[in-house]
Amino acid sequence: MEISERLTQEFKINPTYTANIIKLIDDGNTIPFIARYRKEMHGNLDDQILREFADRLTYLRNLDKRKEEVRSSITEQGKMTEEIETALAEANTLTEVEDIYRPYKQKKKTRATVALAKGLEPLADIVQAQTVASGTAEDLAKPYVNEEKGVNSVKEALDGAKDIIAERISDNAELRKKLRKIFLKQAEISTKLVEDKENAKTYEMYKDYSEPVSEIKSHRVLAINRGEAEECLKVKVEFDKAFGIRICEASVVKPGSVTTYLVEEAAADGYERLIFPSMEREIRAYLTDMASEQAIKMFEVNLRPLLMQPPLKNKIVLGYDPAYRTGCKLAVVNQQGTVLYKTCLLYTSPSPRDSTSS
């Protein structure tokens, strides 16, 4: 779906207005200018809706740009498939795009990349397939012991295979999407007070504090962030570890194989070492973004009455905004700032150049 079509659907406006707003923004016009002086081009939308429209337009353009970058990178690696192409086309957020790209992203040195460099990927494939029902996992690993490559024992070979599988599990886009939703519903934010810090008393209420991620208020998120920045609070995301591991196991474990236990160990390691820290960072970033956005909205609400207060104490005021094309706008407000009357006067003349008669 084209960006303009999506914006038309999301904001429930006429497609012509959508095209007009996009052009006005691209031409460098500010939101206040568009809201006030180009009303006929967007159906008299207020500045708040127009600002949301502009933000969404920017996000969708960044989303399309990132999709193309990811598509090009995966294609250059010769790993593009119809499944990946479809997933990219259906991705609605930057987070989903990054989840898709994660397995193909050039990584820094990790335990899995070290194991891959040692030639242990075929062993990881065998272990993860879990199709061998007889013998032992050690028997499968013996051919991969190679001192020249740094694989000095069967245990090292199996450990390397598990590292590869753990990273694969961590890179599973569908699994991460599922866990992210569950974390947002069930995870909690917990804090501990660092009592020997100078400003510790300021954050006394967060001494032994916890609250569900789904319920925490924006002002508490910002307060916790300040306390952490001042090193007065230790902050963690809490989630049932056993439950998280079970979800990971369910995505990859097949019972009845001599390698099943290794995949279970890899799933547990992948969750604890890779997935949970990543989810914790994502949850914290999400809460901070939501809290900051809410704080801005609250600031707007508090600022509005200050800006709209009567300009002259105990006086009735006539406001006059002259304009030729759109007419002269007049409004009368009473001593309390209530609008008593408003109108628009259109002055015309036989010739646009005849400014005197106008």
Model regions and ranges:
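Short, small/acidic-rich helices and loops at N termini and domain boundaries
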Residues: 44, 52, 56-58
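Duplex nucleic acid-engaging cores and interfaces of nucleic-acid transaction enzymes
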Residues: 49-51, 63, 68-69, 73, ...
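Short alpha-helical segment immediately N-terminal to, or the first helix within
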Residues: 23-24, 90
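Feature marking long nucleic-acid-engaging regions of large polymerase/nuclease enzymes
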Residues: 30-44
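Short alpha-helical scaffolding segments that buttress acidic/His motifs in well-ordered protein cores
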Residues: 21-22, 101
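Generic start-of-chain signal for non-secretory N-termini
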Residues: 1-19, 26
